[in-house]
């Protein structure tokens, strides 16, 4: 007869009317009993012939692709002018005095952040924007391009200009070596008074026939300032600063993506000073002489008259011919849905390319991408805005993968010890937290995103046309991409983007200037950054509490008024560092803080309401006696595991599920096991804060007997049959707790000390978890353990009781670090004197 739920509860000693613990508990360690129960509950029957169930409620297999929905009305979020102050360490010093070693180390990690992959795989530009929404290809293309353009304008991306240079918007950092109109500006590291040392050497950017001569000049200019050699020094030295043949030129040198159809080299001097203004298309009448002013770095405007007419004309034709969009102007419409009609809507489509305010040298950057991008909803609650997903997963795969640094996250108990108090709480929202941290330009060639331009993107996705060879294109295959769908999409998009359609239809390659989200390094760097900042804040306001996890920052203070003044002070400090907060999203929690999925109050910690609801729904949908795919079980365990510490039996109750996932076999819920789990998760108990205290109760065991020392009283007992040492140590700890009721027990067994009971016999683990709930353990070396003698059957010998103080841990969060701490070889774990026990000190 299968085991009923009531019998199973009795067996696990969850009911009060169980017999004496010393007799009942050792039975649960018996292998035979565990095996029989597993068979009764159908836990061991892994090989099933019935087809597996692949969906339970909302849970599908871990890797099943839930198809995201595309929203044509997505708004691109705006990014404030985020610029983290470069002298952040000095700013913190002014705020709090000398920094501790830890804080300094963490802040140096991100100023600037560096990224060293083992191998970088370059992908063709066509893979830049992922065809994630086959129904909305063109729409998605333009929305993504607009998002990337917004990021570039906000100074979060570099734009690749040539193989060795990039441009960006926003304020430059001292490690970004600036080039101005083809010159390298060498700067010293201090950037405050702009006392940068700028020798006026002329380094023409593109590789030119006068290579050695210019390189030697650059080499000299590193040694010291030289006489200014005029704006066109490169040309005066006997040779034309020619741009690499056949690439349409702009005042910025080569764009480096689209080859132009004019085959000859342009001999105009437009790499060191500007020849034509950005795009020759703006001037409808191609005048033989073009004049344009451009401010040189020294401040005087250089006018360039009388450029030979043939060169200016060849350039203007080159830029029109190389521009897929504008070519439609000179062609005949192929149908009523021809792009010719859209291109002729307005005369001035603006420039073919935009350039940033600053231009810097970069390592060699190929015209490729290293990761694809696509758009999704910003979050489940906000579907009106989009979020860019960047896939740099190549760095986490294969045998060349980067092993990302590990970092400490406080576990549930440490978090409760730290935050469970009667403080008032408030949480801050850092807007675009990842985009605060600057990356070194050397990382740019590894983190490239972009697109191959609309023509190739459409050609790649439409089945009837080949990818056009830009070099030898005829008017006919220019029109290959015309279609009704494209025409309709572009007409609608024209309302949104206007003449930007032209700009966005060009190819572009962008590298990250701030850390992107799709790289495993980013969460680590963000965690280091926010924890260092919070550490500084905690030391500046010792009577308050500041804590962070990733971009989630919480502040706690004794009273609401106090909290508001703390909020004002901390906000000003963060703004002075260049950290952008979102004041609309500041949440005031009162006395129970919502943080990391938990509700934390003075009574302890519980999971948030939405998680409890999810668990209830999960049990409602959970089928009985049907094998469930182990990938779905992974999902179920993920949800139940989060709330396991709040149940009677904890993690051990989920062990049968873990076992089936490890064996990659389907799992079948028997009615009893489902009822047992359901009951477990109906009543959740808070995890309470551990209190410091003196340990008075000790437990010890040998394979045949156990012994307790409770105050001056000694007890001993024997087991019917010898048991493994870890099992008997756990039994002894359970007896000590049930006999004395003490919440603090001394033991010499590391497994019991760890409070992970998942490796014990299943029934024993479940029962022990309930008996030892809320118990703290202190380590006692065996030689000093007063319960050692009774466990060996010797009651007469007394070892003196130890005075063992217990201090609850707060993980790696040192709350009261002395300013500036003297680093000892092994730092003590810093004691968290709760704000409850510390008399309030004025700031």
From Swiss-Prot:
InterPro entries according to UniProt: DNA/RNA_pol_sf (IPR043502), DNApol_viral_C (IPR001462), DNApol_viral_N (IPR000201), HBV_DPOL (IPR037531), Rev_trsase/Diguanyl_cyclase (IPR043128), RT_dom (IPR000477), Viral_Replic_Matur_Polypro (IPR051320)
Protein name (database record): Protein P
Record EC number: 2.7.7.7, 2.7.7.49, 3.1.26.4
Catalytic activity: DNA(n) + a 2'-deoxyribonucleoside 5'-triphosphate = DNA(n+1) + diphosphate; Endonucleolytic cleavage to 5'-phosphomonoester
Feature: compositional bias, Low complexity: 223-235
Family label: Belongs to the hepadnaviridae P protein family.
Organism of derivation: Hepatitis B virus genotype B2 (isolate Indonesia/pIDW420/1988) (HBV-B)
Region named Terminal protein domain (TP): 1-177
Gene name for this UniProt entry: P
């Amino acid at each position: 007869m299968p085991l009923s739920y009531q019998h199973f509860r009795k067996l696990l000693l969850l009911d009060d009317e169980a017999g004496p613990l010393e007799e009942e508990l050792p039975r649960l360690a018996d292998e035979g009993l565990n095996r029989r129960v597993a068979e009764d509950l159908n836990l061991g029957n892994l090989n099933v012939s019935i087809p597996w169930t692949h969906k339970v409620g909302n849970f599908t297999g871990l890797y099943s692709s839930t198809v995201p929905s595309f929203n044509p009305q997505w708004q691109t979020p705006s990014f404030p002018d985020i610029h983290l102050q470069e002298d952040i360490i000095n700013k913190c010093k002014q705020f709090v005095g000398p920094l501790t070693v830890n804080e300094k180390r963490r802040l140096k990690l991100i100023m600037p952040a560096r990224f060293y992959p083992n191998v970088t795989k370059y992908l063709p530009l066509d893979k830049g924007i992922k065809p994630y929404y086959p129904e909305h290809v063109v729409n998605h293309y333009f929305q993504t391009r607009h998002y990337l353009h917004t990021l570039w304008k906000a100074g979060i991306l570099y734009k690749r200009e040539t193989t060795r240079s990039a441009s960006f918007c926003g304020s430059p950092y001292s490690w970004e070596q600036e080039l101005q109109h083809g010159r390298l500006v060498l700067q010293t590291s201090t950037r405050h008074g702009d006392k940068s040392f700028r020798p006026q050497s002329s380094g023409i950017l593109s590789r030119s026939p006068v290579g050695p001569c210019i390189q030697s000049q650059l080499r000299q200019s590193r040694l010291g300032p030289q006489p200014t050699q005029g704006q066109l020094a490169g040309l005066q030295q006997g040779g034309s600063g020619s741009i690499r043949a056949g690439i349409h030129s702009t005042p910025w040198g080569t764009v480096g993506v689209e080859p132009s159809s004019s085959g000859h080299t342009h001999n105009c001097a437009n790499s060191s000073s500007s020849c034509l203004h950005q795009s020759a298309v703006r001037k409808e009448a191609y005048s033989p002489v073009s004049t344009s002013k451009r401010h040189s770095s020294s401040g005087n405007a250089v006018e360039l008259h009388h450029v030979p007419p043939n060169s200016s004309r060849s350039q203007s034709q080159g830029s029109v011919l190389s521009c897929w969009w504008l070519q439609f102007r000179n062609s005949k419409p192929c149908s009523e849905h021809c792009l010719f009609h859209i291109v002729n809507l307005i005369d001035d489509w603006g420039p073919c390319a935009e350039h940033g305010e600053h231009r810097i040298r970069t390592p060699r950057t190929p015209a490729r991408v290293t990761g694809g991008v696509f758009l999704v909803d910003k979050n489940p609650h906000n579907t009106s805005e989009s979020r860019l997903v960047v896939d740099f997963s190549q760095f986490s795969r294969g045998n060349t993968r980067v092993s990302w640094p590990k970092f400490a996250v406080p576990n549930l108990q440490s978090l409760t010890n730290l935050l469970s108090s009667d403080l008032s709480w408030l949480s801050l929202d850092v807007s675009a937290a990842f985009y605060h941290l600057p990356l070194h330009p050397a990382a740019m060639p590894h983190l490239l995103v972009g697109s191959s331009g609309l023509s190739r993107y459409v050609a790649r996705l439409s089945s009837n046309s080949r990818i056009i060879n830009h070099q030898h294109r005829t008017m006919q295959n220019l029109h290959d991409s015309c279609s009704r769908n494209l025409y309709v999409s572009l007409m609608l998009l024209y309302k949104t983007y206007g003449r930007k359609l032209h700009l966005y239809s060009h190819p572009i390659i962008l590298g990250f200037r701030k850390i992107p989200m799709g790289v495993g390094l980013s969460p680590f760097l963000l965690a280091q950054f926010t924890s260092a900042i919070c550490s500084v804040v905690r030391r500046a306001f010792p009577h308050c509490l500041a804590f962070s996890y990733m971009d989630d920052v919480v502040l706690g203070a004794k009273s609401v008024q106090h909290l508001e003044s703390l909020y004002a002070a901390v906000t000003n400090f963060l703004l002075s560092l260049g950290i952008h907060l979102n004041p609309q999203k500041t949440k005031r929690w009162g006395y129970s803080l919502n943080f990391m999925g938990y509700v934390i109050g003075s009574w302890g910690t519980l999971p948030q309401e939405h998680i409890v609801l999810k668990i209830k729904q999960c049990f409602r949908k959970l089928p009985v006696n049907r094998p469930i795919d182990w990938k779905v079980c992974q999902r179920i365990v993920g949800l139940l595991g989060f709330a396991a510490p709040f149940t009677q039996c904890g993690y051990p109750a989920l062990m049968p599920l873990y076992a089936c996932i490890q064996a990659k076999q389907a799992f079948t819920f028997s009615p009893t096991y489902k009822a047992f789990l359901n009951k477990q998760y109906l009543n959740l108990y808070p995890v309470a804060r551990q209190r410091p205290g003196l340990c008075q109760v000790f437990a010890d065991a040998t394979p045949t007997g156990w012994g307790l020392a409770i105050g001056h009283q000694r007890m001993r007992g024997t087991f019917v049959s010898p048991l493994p040492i870890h099992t008997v140590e756990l039994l002894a700890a359970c007896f000590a707790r049930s006999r004395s009721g003490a919440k603090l027990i001394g033991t010499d067994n590391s497994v019991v000390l760890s409070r992970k009971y998942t490796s014990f016999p299943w029934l024993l683990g479940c029962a022990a978890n309930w008996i030892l709930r809320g118990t703290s353990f202190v380590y006692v070396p065996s030689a000093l353990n007063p319960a050692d003698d009774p466990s060996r059957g010797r009651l007469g010998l007394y070892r003196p009781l130890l005075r063992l103080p217990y201090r609850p841990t707060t993980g790696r969060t040192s709350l009261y670090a002395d300013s500036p701490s003297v680093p000892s070889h092994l730092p003590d774990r810093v004691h968290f004197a709760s704000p409850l026990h510390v008399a309030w000190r004025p700031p």
